[in-house]
UniProtKB/Swiss-Prot annotation:
GO cellular component, one term: nuclear envelope
Biased composition (Polar residues): 351-363
Source organism of the structure: Xenopus tropicalis (Western clawed frog)
GO biological process, alphabetically ordered: cell division; protein ubiquitination
Organism domain of life: Eukaryota
Protein name: Zinc finger C3HC-type protein 1-like
Name of the gene: zc3hc1
Main location: nucleus
Keyword flag Metal-binding: yes
Amino acid sequence: MATSCEDVSPVKSPAVTPLKIRELINEGIVTGERSSIGRKETAVVPEENNGFEDPLSNSSYESTSKDAFFGRVESFSSLKWAGKPSELCPLICAKYGWSNIECDMLKCSSCNAYLCASLQPVLDFSKYKQRCVELQEALRKAHEKFCFWPDSPCPDYFWALMVTEPSSVLSDFVGRFDNLCHLEIQLPSIKHEDLKNMDITEETVSHLLRLIEDELKSKDGREDNSRLASDSLQVHISACILALCGWSTSYTSGSLCIINCPRCMRKVGLWAFQQLEAVELDNSLSAPNTPVSPAEGHERSPFGIMSPNRRVTRSRDAEQSPALAYGRTRSSDLLSPADSEAVRSRPVTRSMGQGESSGLSNELHSSPLRRSKRPRLCSSSSSDTSPRGCFDPLSQHRSWCPWVNVCQASETSTLGSEIQEEASRKEYGWKEVLNVLLAEENSRTLSDPDTSSVPEKSHKVFRIFRQWQMAASASENP
């Protein structure tokens, strides 16, 4: 037993144990060189993680990005998302991160979850409402477990009309008006009957044009509208009405004439509608006591202005001097049936009204039914005779667009009956914007009594509205 104790004792001797302890302590001490290397290694770590997508930062970007929101709204179409109630409109779906990928099929932009939102046709209305409520709940709860959309949806002011901020409403309105003026006579023609249904009168348009003029003066410090793309009053009236109803454009030279709604993402090609009557306003407005017939207003055309879709079919008109257009008349309206057939049997050439038709011209000059025509650059024999309707600035919006729906008020369930009654009188979005603009114009008029230019412009606006009304009545009663 003693031998075994002696064999073990050298391992635990005091001479050996302190050396081991000293080595262990030295291993735990970091020298200056090693510490600098460690600091360099820790500094490199954030650079290596730069490519890593933080879910929290990604969620804050998605839920606060207005462009991403309207990108999801644009994915909804009438073919893939039809027959849905207002509670399931694309604005509400995009609010919670959903995009429309197939018919009645939604996909989350973050967690890639899918949601089938089909509504089966049922005769029981209570079951239909129950299904709608289930889909409303699914918009929030159908995401994956750690998806951020249920807790941080997009704010409502992304698409709401900020009627409580007059300065924002006015600046947006003037911006849309300025953009639309670039289309000039390519702007669509608006039916006078639609303006009557909207309760838009000549006086209303005059006030809005006055407000636009004052706003441009305050921004640029100019006394005229030289910064606008067009100085035509008829163009200004049409652009004013379209801007009031929420339409704008990103038109550039050489591009197609398309107007769009920034709220419902609706895009409309203006070549499918009747464009503005090509009337030379300087001549038509110079004689206020001279009545203008609808047919004459339809035939007028300003020199040097032609819409792009007419340049293709009427490119040959540039070969002829405008002076030759004075003698051009529509003889089919004034001739007998036999003479009319004889004229139609001959080919229509550029020399009509001259040469062999000189006798016909003399007869027309002596006819008491002859009406004086203004010079036209467009040939009456053009094949561009496809029927085009007028543009309705309200019905062209999508049914769920905020511009054509009642503005949503805040919850008033705990408030008094008077406030609830006032909230129930909320009007359509475009009407709320109109009230804000008129109130702003009224306040400026009271503060600035110098309104000498208003009667002149108002008189011209009244005349253009009368021309539109006469043209509408003539088309209804040919």
